[in-house]
């Protein structure tokens, strides 16, 4: 059932949500999910996020790496566990097999393959199920995946760097950055969580952008580069062609 969560549930779920953010944009066609297992004694005994390229699922990893007996434990998961077989085994069945007593879910999975079936299976197996804990925060993480499976459309985000008065550069065009170091790092973090980055040819010509992610530890998670250039005017010396 949907609950008004207590502070304890929120604390564990917030940890799970932070785990889900780790691989956001790098789990292939699968959502990036966070999972935290809490023992009957209220101790965290395992935690995991979805593997790179979407496999294994977070629940499976968390169960396999648990440091104690998980029978009777509570599982906090950011998205409804699946109950269908595909490239990965059904997570709902796995939780029942491990005799988990309670599952707290942040957001229901509207994927037609799931769509409440995981929750129903858990309840039919006498597992206590609570949903809706920090659901709005989970939706920010899951929105790209859910928009694709429900509507067949990608999530598109627009990044604009501007000054307080709405300007993007000096009049003479000599300004290099109007952003600070923190906002530039955030921009690179956004690149690491998206499949593609699109710019017009004028951006390439004026900024000589690389369009990659240059954050330590995330350099291999750069997006596909898409350049709108109907006249094929991109200079062969452009940085974007060297990477």
Model-derived features: where do they sit?
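Short loop/turn microsegments at loop-to-beta-strand junctions
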Residues: 31-33, 45, 156-158
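Acidic, glycine-enriched active-site microenvironments
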Residues: 12, 28-33, 71-74
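Active-site ligand-binding patch in enzyme domains
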Residues: 147-148, 157-164, 168-243
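Short beta-strand scaffold segments in enzyme catalytic cores
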Residues: 33-39, 160-161
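Residue-level signal for inorganic ion chemistry
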Residues: 16, 34, 82, 122, ...
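Zn2+-dependent cytidine deaminase-like catalytic core
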Residues: 37-138, 224-226
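Proteins enriched for Cys/Gly/acidic motifs involved in redox and nucleic-acid/cofactor modification
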Residues: 25-27, 119, 133-161
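Short, basic/aromatic recognition patches
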Residues: 8-28, 148
């Amino acid at each position: 059932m949907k609950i008004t969560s207590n502070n304890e549930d929120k604390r564990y779920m917030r940890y799970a949500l932070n785990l889900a953010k780790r691989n956001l944009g790098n789990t292939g066609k699968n959502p990036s999910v966070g999972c935290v297992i809490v023992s009957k004694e209220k101790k965290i005994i395992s935690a995991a996020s979805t593997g790179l390229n979407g496999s294994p699922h977070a629940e499976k990893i968390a169960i396999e790496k648990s440091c104690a007996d998980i029978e009777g434990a509570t599982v906090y998961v950011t998205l409804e566990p699946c109950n269908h077989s595909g490239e990965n085994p059904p997570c709902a069945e796995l939780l029942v097999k491990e005799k988990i007593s309670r599952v707290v879910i942040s957001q229901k999975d509207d994927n037609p393959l799931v769509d409440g079936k995981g929750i129903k299976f858990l309840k039919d197996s006498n597992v206590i199920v609570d949903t809706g804990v920090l659901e709005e925060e989970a939706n920010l993480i899951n929105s790209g995946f859910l928009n694709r499976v429900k509507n067949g459309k990608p999530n598109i985000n627009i990044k604009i760097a501007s000054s307080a008065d709405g300007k993007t550069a000096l009049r003479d065009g000599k300004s290099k950055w109007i952003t600070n170091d923190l906002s530039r790092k955030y921009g690179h973090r956004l690149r690491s969580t998206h499949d593609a980055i699109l710019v017009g040819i004028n951006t390439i010509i004026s900024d000589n952008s690389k369009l990659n992610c240059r954050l330590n530890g995330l350099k291999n998670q750069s997006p596909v580069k898409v350049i709108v250039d109907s006249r094929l005017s991109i200079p062969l010396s452009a940085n974007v062609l060297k990477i």
